[in-house]
From Swiss-Prot:
The keyword Ribosomal protein applies. GO terms for biological process: translation. The keyword Nuclease does not apply. This is Large ribosomal subunit protein bL35. Signal peptide: none annotated. The lineage of its organism: Bacteria, Pseudomonadati, Pseudomonadota, Alphaproteobacteria, Sphingomonadales. GO terms for cellular component: ribonucleoprotein complex; ribosome.
């Protein structure tokens, strides 16, 4: 059986933690930030953990992991 390919969009957007969780960057911080307050910009600077329901789907798209 041939090797499974990883979805290229998953390679660009997600990282796996050592415990098996999936991290991603928070959306909404590329442009038009002048209309948002400092709290919004600060909170969107960090990475976030994907919910457990979507976790299974993303792991299926990256069968051999990403790290």
């Amino acid at each position: 059986m041939p090797k499974l390919k990883t979805k290229s969009g998953v390679k660009k957007r997600f990282k796996f933690t050592a415990n098996g969780k999936v991290k991603h960057g928070v959306a909404g911080k590329r442009h038009r930030l002048i209309s948002h307050n400092a709290k919004y910009i600060r909170q969107h600077r960090r990475t976030d953990v994907v919910s457990s329901t979507e976790n299974r789907t993303i792991k299926a798209w990256a069968p051999y992991g990403l790290n």
